[in-house]
């Protein structure tokens, strides 16, 4: 009889172990009737990981303080720390765990009655804006949607196996987290506003090129993709300990008013090594533009602001009378123009790289007035025209990248038409854009010459055309009548989008006039 071969267990790598923990946690969550798909599961997993991450970091800092003979104040007091209620596998579970997390007042893990976990975390505050404020902001809009306390205990036990004190594990988890954000965007379907393709983010940050010592802002931070990329870009410039210290303090700033993206953004930045994320949880457009002064300005803005949405009437009061619009992309463009630092000592001043829909390029009326200010007072030096489907299947609206600084006025605008890979007609969810595809554009960027992909238009020509920035490639041979059906459909879609914008503007006028 031939002896059976025993299967040799191959030790899992750190990446495989972490992937296994995350996947196991998500499988457990699928059994809970309170959760409905990845749109519920990822935020749930995020706040659990956030508390474990925080406790691991606190224990490291506490030990460092002891060795240095210094006092250490914990951000979270007992019995609300992870180590108090979550780290023991046989700890609080079932209905008691749900009650402890959800209720304003509950029996705590130490047996005493007091504030529930979320109620306590939301009440945290500090005098100098430390982690306690960050924690309170994170949990202000966070909800525990799991209803089975036994399943929740199983998830907590899984997450307890992640060691956030290991740099390798944090790096790996950061990558895993990005893949989960992509899945969340996929699950969101038409409302997938959380994720800008990483290759596009990397290209924008690469050409805007933030330098150590500069301040960087994303006024529509979402899940923090631009800030993470800017952090990685700046981290490579750090040569000394002091450099890294300055990078961590006051360099990166984001604004994200929606509770879910705010939580995801905080976690994304923490996992990538940003120790004190400075994310404002309120509306970026809440201040009158005229009140924005030098102290509010920054060196670099990289962003993909929302477009197609509408803002409340109170927000529109913050904008000049002749530039009020229902188009959020145009509102953010005006904000960005005010937020860029003025030139000092021969510098170009603040600079920006941002995503805009085609409607911004060809829009007239209020849109044209905003663009005229951009051309006359800023240096709009480059527009990169993106190919079809960069954001597919979430939107088919054609998009562009604007690059400008405060060294204006504009003399001419360079256009670069980013092509699709050879043989491709579109990007798709399974075959998205890759960073390597920007290699030719990056090579062209510093040695600009006209070519079949690049051309320039004088500002006089642009102003004479009513600030129409929607300039076609003069080398293009296709006539619209001979375009493929798919591209014709997109051209029609572009015009439909413009009609929607005009109708939104008419609606705004009717509301403001009280008609």
Regions found by a protein language model. Name each.
Residues 1-212, 278-289, 385-390, 411-419, ...:
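Non-catalytic, mostly N-terminal accessory regions of nucleic-acid modification and defense proteins
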Residues 14, 85, 170, 178-182, ...:
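S-adenosylmethionine
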Residues 15, 145, 166, 220, ...:
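Hydrophobic alpha-helical scaffolding
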Residues 32-35, 312-328, 358-366, 386-394, ...:
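Short, contiguous acidic/charged loop-to-helix segments that flank catalytic cores in large enzymes
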Residues 41, 204, 257-262, 325-403:
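Conserved Class I SAM-dependent methyltransferase catalytic core
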Residues 190-303, 308-310, 324-326, 330-331, ...:
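Conserved S-adenosyl-L-methionine
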Residues 379-380, 392-440:
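C-terminal, active-site-flanking charged/polar segments
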């Amino acid at each position: 009889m031939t002896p059976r071969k025993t299967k040799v267990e191959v030790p899992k790598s750190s990446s495989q172990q972490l992937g296994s923990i995350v996947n196991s946690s998500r499988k457990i969550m699928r059994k809970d009737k309170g959760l409905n798909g990845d749109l519920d599961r990822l935020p749930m997993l995020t706040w659990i990981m956030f508390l474990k991450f925080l406790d691991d970091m606190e224990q490291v800092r506490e030990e460092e303080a002891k060795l240095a003979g210094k006092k250490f104040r914990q951000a979270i007091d007992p019995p609300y720390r992870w180590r108090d209620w979550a780290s023991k596998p046989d700890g609080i579970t079932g209905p008691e765990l749900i009650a402890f997390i959800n209720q304003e007042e509950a029996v705590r893990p130490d047996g005493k009655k007091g504030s529930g976990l979320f109620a306590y975390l939301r009440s945290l505050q500090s005098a100098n804006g430390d982690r306690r404020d960050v924690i309170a902001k994170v949990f202000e809009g966070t909800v525990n949607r799991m209803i089975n306390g036994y399943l929740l205990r199983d998830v907590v036990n899984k997450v307890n196996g992640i060691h956030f004190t290991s740099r390798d594990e944090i790096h790996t988890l950061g990558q895993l987290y990005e893949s989960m954000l992509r899945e969340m965007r996929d699950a969101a379907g038409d409302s997938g506003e959380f994720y800008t393709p990483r290759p596009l983010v990397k290209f924008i940050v690469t050409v805007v090129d933030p330098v150590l010592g500069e301040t960087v802002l994303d006024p529509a931070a979402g899940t923090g993709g631009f800030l993470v990329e800017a952090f990685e870009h700046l981290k490579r410039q750090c040569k000394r300990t002091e450099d890294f210290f300055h990078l961590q303090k006051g360099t990166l700033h984001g604004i994200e008013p929606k509770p879910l993206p705010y939580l995801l953004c905080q976690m994304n930045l923490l996992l990538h090594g940003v120790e004190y994320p400075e994310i404002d949880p309120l509306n970026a457009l809440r201040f009158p533009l005229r009140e924005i002064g030098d102290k509010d300005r920054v060196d670099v803005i990289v962003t993909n602001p929302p477009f197609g949405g509408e803002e409340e009437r109170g927000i529109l009061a913050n904008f000049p009378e002749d530039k009020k619009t229902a188009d959020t992309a145009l509102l953010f463009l005006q904000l960005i123009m005010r937020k860029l630092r003025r030139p000092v000592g021969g510098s170009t001043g603040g600079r920006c790289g941002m995503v805009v829909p085609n409607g911004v390029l060809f829009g007239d009326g209020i849109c044209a007035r905003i663009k005229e200010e951009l051309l006359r007072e800023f240096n709009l030096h480059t527009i990169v025209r993106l190919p079809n489907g960069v954001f597919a299947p979430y939107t088919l609206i054609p998009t562009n990248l604007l690059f400008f600084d405060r060294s204006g006025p504009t003399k001419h605008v360079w256009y670069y038409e980013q092509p699709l890979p050879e043989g491709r007609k579109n990007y798709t969810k399974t075959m998205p854009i890759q960073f390597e595809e920007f290699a030719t554009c990056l090579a062209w960027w510093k040695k600009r010459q006209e070519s079949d992909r690049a051309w320039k238009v004088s500002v006089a020509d642009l102003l004479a055309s009513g600030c129409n920035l929607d300039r076609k490639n003069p080398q293009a041979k296709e006539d619209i009548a001979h375009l493929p059906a798919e591209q014709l459909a997109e051209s029609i879609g572009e015009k439909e989008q413009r009609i929607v914008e005009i109708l939104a503007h008419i609606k705004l006028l009717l509301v403001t006039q009280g008609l």
